[in-house]
């Protein structure tokens, strides 16, 4: 999985996109996402952060044994998976107008996107604790490093969208500009739906 992602990130057009589609399965992609999601949320707990749905409190019987509310984490994980399936369905409905493509392949592309979106969060969270430690001794440099990480994260989100476009093009061979417009609309639309959902349950 690590080799597939490395090739996709650094050599997407030549071999990366085709390699990850041919060598990874839905199971391997889901397993990788589960691993990095778990690590990310463990890091969030260690640095004292909150998950996206932290205001939604629904007591579970297991909470008294683990010392925190588990429901926001379950909701966060479930929402990411459902969004991934929803994006795959939108891609399937759209691209089957022009060409025949299996839903399972588009689900793989959507899961790849989901995995990629977790990586910048992992890097940021992994470095957040050292930055907090540095802030005690040098607030200026700590803030400068943190702002740099935010900038890199913003750039990485754009590059991840580009990789999503490359994967869809390699799979469907539909017009690149059309795919780019579709991806922008879908990602912005999904983000807006997430925000509406968060506001409605908070």
Description of each model-found segment:
Residues 99-201:
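Hydrophobic alpha-helical transmembrane segments and adjacent short intramembrane/lumenal linkers
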Residues 1-70:
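N-terminal juxtamembrane cytosolic/stromal segments of multi-pass membrane proteins
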Residues 76-91, 154-161:
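Hydrophobic alpha-helical transmembrane segments
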Residues 19-20, 92-98, 167-170:
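Helix-loop junctions at the membrane interface of multi-pass solute transporters
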Residues 62-84:
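Interfacial helix-start motif at the membrane-water boundary
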Residues 52-58, 84-101:
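Membrane-helix interface/capping segments
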Residues 52-70, 132-142, 198-202:
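Membrane-interface interhelical loops and short amphipathic "cap" helices
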């Amino acid at each position: 999985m690590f080799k597939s992602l490395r090739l996709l990130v650094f050599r997407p057009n030549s071999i990366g996109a085709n390699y990850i589609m041919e060598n990874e399965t839905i199971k391997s992609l889901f397993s990788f996402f589960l691993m990095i999601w778990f690590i990310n949320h463990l890091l969030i707990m260690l640095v004292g952060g909150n998950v996206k749905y932290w205001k939604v409190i629904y007591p579970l019987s297991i909470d008294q044994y683990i010392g925190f509310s588990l429901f926001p984490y379950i909701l966060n994980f479930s929402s990411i998976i459902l969004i991934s399936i929803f994006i795959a369905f939108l891609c399937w409905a759209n691209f089957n107008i022009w060409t025949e493509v299996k839903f399972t392949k588009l689900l793989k592309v959507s899961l790849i996107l989901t995995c990629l979106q977790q990586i910048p969060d992992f890097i940021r969270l992994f470095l957040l604790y050292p930055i907090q430690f540095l802030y005690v001794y040098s607030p200026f440099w700590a803030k400068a490093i943190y702002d740099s990480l935010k900038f890199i994260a913003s750039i990485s989100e754009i590059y991840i969208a580009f990789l999503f476009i490359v994967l869809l093009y390699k799979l469907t061979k539909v017009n690149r500009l059309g795919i780019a417009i579709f991806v922008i609309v879908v990602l912005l639309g999904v983000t807006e739906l997430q925000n509406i959902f968060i506001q409605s349950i908070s």
